[in-house]
């Protein structure tokens, strides 16, 4: 399913993996998309000795990421193809500590301080260009805070749920069954909404406070000049 050039790229991307990952697949033997899902995940798993697939009979089409045999809280309902293929790769890399899309330490501490349990579900379209940013942000939060779980759902495969929830646009994020966010969203925006809804554990909210001699606000010519002047001093 994956082209050989892409497989070679994936071998390089996964070369540094240290943990062992499992795509724990649950799929109905009669599901029309079963072969496509198994071929995609099988091709990805072939690119690393640290990734394997386990297939179980189920009544849907989904898989959960396991790390060293333990559940990570990240589940994909559907086939993470198209724009969501990167979301799958980043989920593995983030769980292994190799990801590049984590925010700074202070923001990570805010995620860790969120009170749980929090169960998040994001409905997406594989052609949506705004969906991956939201999926990847929430997967990263799930990696940082064990009290969070996150499911990505391909709305095209679960149209009954989309209709029942009256979803009008994607991505649509639900937190424990309640609509939390619709449309494009940045990491900080999503985190702020979760903080408002669930609160934080003050004992974990220990973001490091740093002291600065000079702070330059703005990125225009004046800001650049001020930064250069300050560095010279």
Q: Where do the model's predicted regions map?
A:
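Non-catalytic, surface beta->alpha helical segment in thiol-disulfide oxidoreductase systems
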Residues: 67-99, 174-202
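Thiol-based oxidoreductase modules, predominantly thioredoxin-like and allied folds used
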Residues: 49-59, 146-160
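Aromatic pocket-lining residues of Rossmann-like dinucleotide-binding sites
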Residues: 230
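Long, folded non-catalytic interaction modules
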Residues: 37, 41, 47-48, 52-72, ...
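Local sequence-structure signature of Cys/Sec-based thiol-disulfide redox active-site neighborhoods
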Residues: 3-42, 111-152
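Beta1/beta-strand and adjacent pyrophosphate-binding region of the FAD-binding site
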Residues: 205-222
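Structural micro-motif
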Residues: 57-75, 159-176
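Short N-terminal or domain-adjacent regulatory/targeting segments
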Residues: 1-17, 85-114, 192-202
